[in-house]
A protein has these predicted regions:
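N-terminal secretory signal peptides that target proteins for export/translocation
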Residues: 1-28
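Cap/insert and terminal regions of metallo-dependent hydrolase folds
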Residues: 255-258, 264-269, 275-375
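Binuclear metal-dependent hydrolase catalytic cores
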Residues: 3, 7, 11, 50-258, ...
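Hydrophobic helical h-region of N-terminal Sec-dependent signal peptides
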Residues: 35-43
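N-terminal signal peptide c-region/cleavage motif recognized by signal peptidases
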Residues: 45-47
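Sec-dependent signal peptide recognition
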Residues: 28-36
Length: 382
């Protein structure tokens, strides 16, 4: 099979029934689906949770703060499992449920890395923090949460928009520590009742939030250039993984990070939400796997509405197209970075036909994986 062919899965989604796998039904079904799209498929049985080594687990692959339908993927979230310990990147809608469906148990999570604080990347953080406190106590859990700090001054209103809307004026650009503190404060009535009447553990003892500090002197004005050229910088290191970050452009969102995870088994980079970015290319140089976002331009035309566009429509289209990457641009980033494999995730819309993402093959000649919920991909090359 040509390396340029789209691979639906290096391994199958772990949630499918074992009896179907044993009967070969999954292989036949996906093979027919691939053939119908003119795409060669590489199929393998689902892997159990890795006891050692490292694997990428796609918990959810849909992007955007919306619901695409019952059959659409869950919200964006990924896990890197290294020697049985999990490192999470973003927690979109349904991420907590997917985490457990993937076989990752309470207490296995070591750290969370939030790329940015858009709702579709953080909405299930509260579930992770609040659920299963007794299991976390038994596991002696200690979860570290890393993400963007406070933004600072808000950006100016986009051209053509009216008014001066400011939400939560006392702290309109809240950071990760603020977010976690607010979750705890908002749940205080529930938490206090459970602690005082049921003996449930105080969840505050199981996690700690950290604002990632951008190196001094890199950003002069985030409202002018929120992701200027810079070098990657380390944000986490333990005996299993080293995590580096870099700023990437996503409209005027700031700070907005991409992350690289280096392990003894290989390396994986998560683009987060980004336009085509030299910083991302620098971070991903030589990585085994690049997990990159993608947006379908045809969907943008549909969602914005018929032309001519008014000021609001123009602002929406600009945000969608200039703050994200097309499949071709994701492939270009993978080629420029010299990565071994490209995985498309944070798919916008989550329910687009698979063939819409195939354009990544035009600009990247290595293996391209169309991300699916609960897909497991080993870092080591087979």
């Amino acid at each position: 099979m040509s390396e340029a062919h789209m691979r639906f899965a290096d391994v199958a989604p772990a949630s499918l029934p074992a009896r179907r796998l044993a009967a070969g039904g999954l292989r036949r079904w996906l093979g027919r689906a691939a053939a119908a799209l003119g795409v060669a498929a590489l199929l393998a049985a689902p892997a159990a949770q890795a006891a050692d080594g490292a694997e990428l687990v796609l918990l959810g692959v849909a992007g955007g703060p919306t619901w695409y339908g019952n059959d659409a993927p869950h919200g964006i979230s990924s896990a890197l499992v290294v020697d049985g310990k999990a490192y999470l990147v973003d927690l979109g809608s349904g991420a907590y449920r997917q985490l457990r469906r993937a076989g990752i148990k309470p207490g296995a999570e070591q750290a969370v890395f939030l790329t940015h604080l858009h709702t579709d990347h953080i909405i299930d953080l509260a579930s992770l923090l609040m659920y299963d406190p007794s299991a976390r106590r038994r596991a002696k859990a200690s979860l570290q949460i890393y993400g963007p700090g406070r933004r600072g001054a808000l950006p100016p209103l986009a051209p053509g928009l009216a008014g001066d809307p400011v939400i939560h004026a006392e702290n309109p650009g809240a950071g990760t520590v603020d977010l976690v503190d607010s979750v705890v404060a908002g749940m205080a009535a529930d938490l206090n009742i459970r602690v005082r009447s049921e003996g449930v553990p105080d969840v505050r003892g199981f996690f700690q939030a950290h604002d990632i500090v951008v190196p001094a002197g890199v950003v002069k004005d985030p409202n002018v250039d929120p992701a200027p050229p810079m070098e990657p910088f380390e944000v986490w290191r333990d005996e299993r993984v080293t995590v580096s970050a870099i700023l990437v452009p996503h409209g005027l969102v700031y700070p907005n990070f991409a992350y690289r995870f280096d392990t003894a088994s290989g390396s994986v980079v998560f683009s987060g939400d980004t336009a085509l970015s030299p910083n991302l290319v620098k971070l991903a140089r030589g990585a085994d796997i690049l997990v990159h976002e993608a947006i379908d331009p045809a969907w943008v035309d549909h969602i914005v509405g018929p032309k001519p566009w008014d000021a609001r429509q123009q602002a929406l289209a600009r945000q969608l197209l200039e703050a994200h990457t097309t499949p071709q641009q994701a492939g270009e980033a993978a080629t420029r970075a010299g990565v071994r494999k490209l995985v498309l995730s944070h798919l916008v819309p989550g329910d687009a036909p698979a063939e819409h993402w195939l354009h990544a093959r035009e600009t990247f000649k290595g293996p391209v994986v169309l991300g699916q919920d609960l897909m497991r991909i080993p870092l080591k090359q087979p």
